[in-house]
């Protein structure tokens, strides 16, 4: 059976379903093809379930430290089965919400594996979508005027470190653990690795992180990376940076797993009950029919222009499958850009320097714009405003006074180039910095904005004032 659509979206993750909703809002007949569950990696294997686990870890840690607040507790224990049940309940509730939005928008959802066909009896152009349901039924044929590829990504693997789902895991398998290990080696000290390190430590797991770069969080501002490593080391997490894991040395027993890492010419063996491989993500471009089109790929990702168009002008691609900043909110924004572009609304292209990035560890970190080193490399005459949370009353009230807010600005133009934060609840504060950049606010203007007292947001205002040497409380 063949059905015509204005747009068919291949992939029902965050980028795909948001694109579908926007298309439906514009009156376009829309379909989504999803091989698993609507919501994709973010809802089922990433953002949401991991943050639910992080929240449980935070509550567990707070309960153990309750005496610091004058609250005496005895026999605090962790029921990891209930932790997982709560996580799944959160996921299920949000998944039901996404399904409701599809019905509300009268968006057709096809559950199956979608593949792009070349020119055929259905269309002289490549882009007809064949949907294989996998149950012996005849494939559905969808004939769209426009196609959006939103097939997402999966954990990248290190050759030789094959995942077995038991002792060697990716974040996908780790989210489904029924029991916590006593110890774990995390290969990779990027955002995902650090979130897992923080979470598992708060759950009481002994954590060792091995990172190839010379510092953890190598894409973040240098001061943020150093502060994060320092604070997590104080908690008891072990970091080995500038080290190359040697996959061929991995050995397993019934009790643990061992692997060697080379650092400064020396080889050291590390052992733990489990290993988590967290070295980035790989775009899902295989098996979707790209060979039937003129779409260009580079380094395993689909190449697009600023409007998310591929070389086939009627086929767009968004989200992790095109690389760049592999973040759910970026995929959503790109989905809207793609839809509005083929609808003739001339949307603004995405500016990577306006995208907030968040790390949900303890402490949290967040940033938007250029790092100090990037700003200097781009030729800016840089000035810095920095303010510590230890001088913020609300942070002391919370008992979370580590960290700081750092503003990178141009001394000549007074433009805010980047804002970087590490400390309590900064992932909920970074949007102010993003808005300041969108509105081309100067540090002085942010500093003149009245920030209520006592709040953590005062640190932003004070850091802005500090850029001109005018901070009040430090």
UniProtKB/Swiss-Prot annotation:
> Which InterPro entries does the protein's record reference?
Class-I_Pyr_Nuc-Dis_Oxidored, FAD/NAD-bd_sf, FAD/NAD-binding_dom, FAD/NAD-linked_Rdtase_dimer_sf, Lipoamide_DH, Pyr_nuc-diS_OxRdtase, Pyr_nucl-diS_OxRdtase_dimer, Pyr_OxRdtase_I_AS
Say where the protein is mainly found: cytoplasm
Q: How cofactor binds (record note)?
A: Binds 1 FAD per subunit.
Question: Looking at the record's lineage, which domain of life comes first?
Answer: Bacteria
Q: Name one GO biological process term.
A: 2-oxoglutarate metabolic process
* GO MF terms, alphabetically ordered: dihydrolipoyl dehydrogenase (NADH) activity; flavin adenine dinucleotide binding
UniProt binding sites for NAD(+): 188-192, 211, 245, 278-281
Q: Does the keyword GTP-binding apply?
A: no
Q: What does this protein do?
A: The branched-chain alpha-keto dehydrogenase complex catalyzes the overall conversion of alpha-keto acids to acyl-CoA and CO(2). It contains multiple copies of 3 enzymatic components: branched-chain alpha-keto acid decarboxylase (E1), lipoamide acyltransferase (E2) and lipoamide dehydrogenase (E3).
> What's one Pfam family the UniProt record gives for this protein?
Pyr_redox_2
Question: How would you summarize the oligomeric state and partners of this protein?
Answer: Homodimer.
- Kindly identify the residues recorded as the active site: 453
Q: Name one GO cellular component term.
A: cytoplasm
Q: Which family does it belong to?
A: Belongs to the class-I pyridine nucleotide-disulfide oxidoreductase family.
Q: Which residues hold FAD?
A: 34-42, 51, 114, 320, 328
What name is this protein filed under? Dihydrolipoyl dehydrogenase
Asked if the record carries the keyword Transcription, the reply is no
For this chain, the annotated S-S bridges are: 42-47
Q: Which cofactor does it need?
A: FAD
Q: Where in the cell is it found?
A: Cytoplasm
Which keywords has UniProt assigned to this entry? Cytoplasm, Disulfide bond, FAD, Flavoprotein, NAD, Oxidoreductase, Redox-active center
Catalytic reaction equation(s): N(6)-[(R)-dihydrolipoyl]-L-lysyl-[protein] + NAD(+) = N(6)-[(R)-lipoyl]-L-lysyl-[protein] + NADH + H(+)
Give the gene name: bfmBC
